Regions:
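Extracellular parallel beta-helix/beta-solenoid repeat domains
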Residues: 1-431
Length: 431
């Protein structure tokens, strides 16, 4: 990269480039032909059988470990990025040899050995080694047309990481990396990528003027062992100003589909498809002004989530959010639109409180258990008097007369209007 100089364009022919780490200079462009793959793993081809297990010797890699205490329930070795794959499927790590079973591996770091629970002969076995594919603090970098896979990216770090201003990351497939797939900073753009099956999370971004558009973000957050409610799922955006998240398809992620968390202001979510994400659809948390409009939601959150958790659209200790013209199908479970207030302190632009939020002109399909409204377990009076409003929405419910509309307490649809004055211009359709 240095030999090319600032502003140079690099072309990668089709082929697999293993364990490469690229640090672009200012204004450089990296383009890939169809079939150009940056692969952060080492092929494992030699195994010996020891006591019914298969062993690869000489494995000296040991990636940086972050947040090993943020474990998903039952996970072993969360935050250990030294993943092992068989036929493009990540195996599950265990922390002792006596727990080794089919579908798992044990990395004995003291002996530089990887033990497998299954016979690897005739299979493609790979071990993640390199911590990133493309990363630097340079400005104005473009990355396009690559497949980027199987990097030992630490928790919260990305295989493609644009730490400078104005990166454009487009038309890549980014998959099977331990931590995050893609990260960008201010005035960066993530466009038309397929970001899937990364261990912790698909996307991450922070800064001003960011555009996230046209991406498919799928099946992330399942195998790093990190608790996705701490951080994981489809994508998470922090300390942004003017963030635009538009026309993305975020689906089947473990965690939220899309998540703005901590001091985001002037955010727009527009025209996104958000489907079948385990924790909920869009969560706007401890942040400020946002517009969430013209999105569609199907099957997010699921059953078993209490209160208004797991809403298709969740506004959590945030203010000045307008939610309108969204379509929400929660007929398979989960909640609709939830405004939630807890004790979260204050941030860059004032208190983290759930006030001045407007929910209008949305269409929702709910079960009799699916909730809508505003709830608090801290300073409820401030939330109730804080200018939050619901109006001109259309609700399709399987049964009438249920207490599924919340404004502090829970009410029937009729009392939601008559008692607390919410959704007076809205309609409820039963059946």
């Amino acid at each position: 990269m240095r030999a090319g100089g600032e502003g140079a364009v690099f072309w990668l022919e089709a082929g697999v480039y293993r364990m490469q780490q690229i640090e672009p200079l200012e204004g450089q462009t990296i383009l890939g032909a169809s079939g150009a793959v940056l692969n952060g793993s080492r092929l494992l081809t030699e195994f010996t059988e020891v006591d019914g297990h298969w062993v690869a010797e000489g494995q000296t890699q040991q990636g940086v470990r972050h947040e090993t205490d943020e474990s998903a329930e039952g996970a072993q070795r969360p935050g250990y990025p030294d993943a092992v794959y068989v036929n493009d499927q990540p195996l599950t790590p265990v922390d002792s040899l006596d727990q080794l079973r089919s579908g798992t591996y044990f990395f004995d770091y003291d002996a530089d050995r990887i033990f497998l629970g299954d016979d690897p002969h005739g299979q493609t076995v790979e071990a993640a080694v390199s911590p990133f594919a493309i990363a630097s603090g340079a400005n104005g970098v473009t990355v396009s047309g690559l497949t980027v896979e199987k990097y030992a990216t630490p928790t919260q770090e990305a295989a493609i990481s644009g730490n400078g201003e104005g990166w454009v990351i487009s038309n890549n497939e980014v998959r099977l990396n331990y931590g995050v797939g893609i990260n960008i900073g201010g005035n960066g753009q993530i466009l038309d990528n397929h970001v899937h099956d990364n261990g912790q999370m698909g996307l991450n971004a922070g800064g001003g003027g960011i555009l996230i558009e046209g991406n498919e973000i799928a099946s992330n957050g399942f195998w790093s062992g990190i608790d996705v409610l701490w951080e994981g799922g489809g994508g998470k955006f922090t300390e942004t100003d003017g963030l635009m998240v538009r026309n993305n398809y975020s689906h089947d992620n473990n965690g939220y589909g899309l998540w703005t968390d901590i001091d985001n202001v002037n955010t727009t979510y527009e025209g996104n498809r958000i489907e079948y994400n385990s924790a909920g659809g869009i969560n706007h948390e401890i942040s400020y002004s946002a517009s969430i409009h013209d999105n569609s939601f199907v099957g997010n959150g699921g059953n078993g989530l209490t209160w208004l958790w797991g809403s298709a659209i969740q506004v959590q200790n945030s203010q000045d959010v307008e939610i309108f013209n969204n379509f929400i199908d929660a007929s398979s479970g989960g909640n609709g639109i939830g405004l939630i207030q807890q004790d979260r302190g204050e941030g860059a632009f004032g208190d983290y409180v759930t006030v001045n939020n407007s929910v209008h002109d949305n269409t929702l399909i709910l079960t009799s258990e699916g909730g809508v409204g505003a709830v608090a377990d801290y300073d409820e009076e401030r939330m109730l008097a804080g200018g939050n409003s619901f109006d001109n929405n259309v609700y399709h419910v399987s049964e009438g007369g249920e207490d599924q509309f919340a404004f502090g307490d829970y009410y029937t649809f009729e009392n939601f209007g008559a008692v607390v004055g919410q959704d007076l211009g809205s309609s409820l359709l039963i059946g």
